[in-house]
Regions:
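N-terminal small-domain helix-loop-helix segment of the aminotransferase-like
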Residues: 4-104, 111
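Conserved core of the PLP fold type I
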Residues: 65-177
Length: 177
């Protein structure tokens, strides 16, 4: 019996190491179009005001000596400030420990799926919706169930009864609304 052929192409070698459930998946991508308003990438159509640019520049300059270190991974100061702001805005006491911060929505969604869904568990969502919901769910090993929309008010309608029925049928561990 001869030894298996060793692929010379690095991409082929890496592909062989990939989890079976991820083979054939395509990476998330949002086209970068040259248009006045980019709704697909959550960009602001307006330029950053000069005073904001100056404030950011000053803050970066003041922090430059610490750029060789990772920032506070617990986002302590940010969470304390957000808790104080929420308390002030709502009149409800919010502690920093009750505030969750992350490096963008995708990281927070990934944390939710890692904690509550994952391998052998189910995530349910109703498309059209945020395209990362099924991608994050699948890459974390969850089974994705694409819920159905459509009702008396149109093809994108989603009623409480529809949601409850589909949640009961799919028994998901995470529901994206």
């Amino acid at each position: 019996m001869s030894a298996p052929a060793v692929p010379t192409d690095v991409a082929a070698r890496v592909a062989r190491l990939l989890r079976d459930d991820l083979r054939g998946q395509t990476a998330y991508g949002a086209p970068q179009l040259e248009v006045p308003v980019r709704l697909n990438t959550n960009e602001n159509s307006y330029a950053v005001p000069p005073d904001v640019v100056a404030a950011i520049t000053a803050a970066v300059a003041g922090s430059a000596s610490d750029l060789n270190r990772y920032p506070d991974r617990e986002f302590t100061a940010l969470r304390e400030d957000l808790a104080a702001w929420l308390t002030e805005q709502t009149g409800v006491a919010v502690e920093a420990a009750q505030v969750w911060a992350g490096n963008g929505s995708n990281e927070v969604l990934q944390h939710v799926v890692q904690a509550f869904a994952g391998p052998g568990r189910v995530a349910l969502g109703f498309t059209p919706a945020y395209s990362m919901h099924p991608i994050i769910s699948r890459t974390m090993g969850s089974t994705w169930v694409d819920g159905h929309r459509g009702g008396p008010d149109g093809p994108f309608d989603l009623t409480e009864g529809d949601v409850v029925a589909q949640v009961l049928a799919a028994a998901p561990h995470v529901v994206f609304l």
